[in-house]
Amino acid sequence: MRHIGAIVLGLLLGACGGAGSVSAPSVTPQPSAPASAAVVATPAPTYSPKAEGFTSKVLVEKPREVATSAAGFAWIAAGTSTVGKGVTATVSEKESFTASYETPIDRQAADAKQAIYLTPDLPPLAAGRYTESLRLVVVQAGGRSSAHMHSGIEGVLVLEGQVLVRSGGNAPASLVTGQGFFILPKVPVQLINVGSGVARTLVYSISPEGAPFSTELTESP
C-alpha cells in the first residue's frame, strides 16, 4: 500500500501601506492547515464458495500409466495428436483439442511445439495408474465454480470470455481467451466469470486412479 504524505501549503501575506503619516499595522502570516490526501484500501471482492451458473461436462476420459516418478508438464493443442498421445475431444463443430502430460524432454516433440498452452515443469507425479480427462466448463456471466481442490494436476485453457482465477497461496489472476493456467494437487481454487458474456474453459486433468476428481470446500480461496 502506498502512503501519500501530507502536502503542506504555505501562504505569504504582504503588509499594506496606509494614507498620510499613519502606518498600517503589519500582518503576521498565518500558516494554513496542512492539506493531506489519504489513500483508502479497496477491499478485494469476496465470493461465495458455492457454485452458481456453472456446468462441467466430461468430454473424454481414459487410463494412463506413469512408469517412473519424474518432473513433467501438461500441454493442450488444437486438433489431434500427431503421434497418438494424450486425450482428444471435440468441443464444437469447429473446435477439437488434444492434451497430455509428458516429461520435460518431450517439450521438443511436435505436439508440444504446436501447443496452444504449456505449463512450466511441474513437481513429479508418483509412479502408478492415473486417469486422464478433458472437460468443458461453461460459466454464465456473473457465475462461478465452487471453491474446490483436485486430486491431480490440471491444465486449463480459456476458450471464450474472461475469468478470474483465485487459488490458495497465489494472487488472483485475470485471464482472457487463449490464455491458460495450471493447478497443482490439493491447492484450493475457484473460477469466476468476470466478463460480460459466457466464459468457456477446457480442462485437462491427470488424477490418481480411483481418486475423486475434485473436492468441494466450505471457504473460498
Task: Locate each region found by the language model.
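His-enriched metal-coordination microenvironments in redox/metal-binding proteins
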Residues: 148-152, 157
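Short acidic-glycine-tyrosine-enriched beta hairpin
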Residues: 59-99, 139, 167-186
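Sec-dependent signal peptide recognition
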Residues: 2-9
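Ligand-binding loop in jelly-roll beta-barrel domains
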Residues: 86-110, 185-212
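Bacterial signal peptide processing site
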Residues: 17-20
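Ser/Thr-rich, Proline-interspersed low-complexity disordered segments
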Residues: 22-48, 215-221
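C-terminal motif of bacterial Sec signal peptides marking the signal peptidase cleavage site
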Residues: 12-15
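A short glycine-rich, His/Asp/Glu-containing loop-to-beta-strand
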Residues: 39-74, 111-144, 204
